[in-house]
From Swiss-Prot:
GO biological process, one term: translation
One GO cellular component, as annotated: cytosolic large ribosomal subunit
PANTHER family recorded: CHLOROPLAST 50S RIBOSOMAL PROTEIN L22-RELATED, LARGE RIBOSOMAL SUBUNIT PROTEIN UL22M
Entry protein name: Large ribosomal subunit protein uL22
NCBIfam families: rplV_bact (TIGR01044)
Stored InterPro entries: Ribosomal_uL22, Ribosomal_uL22_bac/chlpt-type, Ribosomal_uL22_bac/org-type, Ribosomal_uL22_CS, Ribosomal_uL22_sf
Record key words, sorted: Ribonucleoprotein, Ribosomal protein, RNA-binding, rRNA-binding
Source species: Syntrophus aciditrophicus (strain SB)
Taxon lineage: Bacteria, Pseudomonadati, Thermodesulfobacteriota, Syntrophia, Syntrophales
GO molecular function: rRNA binding; structural constituent of ribosome
């Protein structure tokens, strides 16, 4: 039985979020939480919240044993980008893309 949680429009670059997501793919939920707690990356906190939400969704189902849950799938998709402008020399402007992410976590029993 699967449990799923998704966080959309998170203001962090997908490239930076994937660095943390790759660390916990396939791990047990307890091990994944420990890894995220000691991660110094900002995306570690965000991914931790999504993992906690997926775990809470799994606990709602009485047929699921929470002790044997593991991260079956976790991925980061690119969301929309906010376009901003930064002033540059001699009256020019440079565009800046502030990227967003959609983070999805799927837990399952081993």
């Amino acid at each position: 039985m699967e449990a799923k949680a998704t966080a959309k429009y998170i203001r962090i670059s997908p490239q930076k979020a994937r660095l943390v997501v790759d660390l916990i793919r396939g791990k047990k939920v307890d091990d994944a939480r420990e890894i995220l707690n000691y991660s110094r990356k900002r995306s570690g906190q965000i991914v931790g919240k999504v993992l906690k939400s997926a775990f809470a969704n799994a606990v709602q189902n009485p047929n699921i044993d929470e002790k044997i849950l593991f991260v079956k799938e976790i991925f980061v998709d690119q969301g929309p980008s906010m376009k901003r402008w930064r002033a540059r020399a001699q009256g020019r402007a440079a565009s800046i893309k502030k990227r967003m992410s959609h983070i999805t976590v799927i837990l399952d029993e081993k």
